[in-house]
């Protein structure tokens, strides 16, 4: 009896956790390893009010820099396409992210191909490390994490959340040390169920929001 009661309580806790306590920021177990250090990241909000993890070197002075070396955004690690998230969608997500983010960053400083003494180096990645199958959660091992909404399991409906994870940093070209780091996740449009293929449009707004935040970021609001 105790075992049965405990199982019921555990299941209830799992449902409550999924229905009301889903984190809006990237949790440590989702860090991809793309950045060398995550320990100094602090929770804050982006220019458009989105929750993010960010670190800015206290001595950072943007007036000391005159250009940014753009390194194309990549997938880290390289994803395996699935029946739900196909290669064409993955390619479109990556290409669009590069286009929008490059344009946004170019509004901050001129982009160059070779670093000078006053250059910043940008590097970024769409990351995906969701492998948890605990409780009522299910994660696809692809950069766009698909999470089963456990609160709808009782009805036979499994609406799928879509999430895009991103990690990026700006590095001082002279010291080769990071001066700004950002880790964030964004929620796209839901899929009807686990059999519904994801379309680029499901995640487009997440990318648009990232680009807007990159354009509007105020370094004085650290």
From Swiss-Prot:
Cleaved signal peptide residues: 1-20
Localization per Swiss-Prot or TrEMBL: Cell membrane
Lipidation (N-palmitoyl cysteine): 21
Pfam family, one: DUF3313
Lipidation (S-diacylglycerol cysteine): 21
Positions in coiled-coil regions: none
Keywords per UniProt: Cell membrane, Lipoprotein, Membrane, Palmitate, Signal
One GO CC annotation: plasma membrane
Topological category with respect to the lipid bilayer: Lipid-anchor
Protein name: Uncharacterized lipoprotein YdcL
Organism name: Escherichia coli (strain K12)
Gene: ydcL
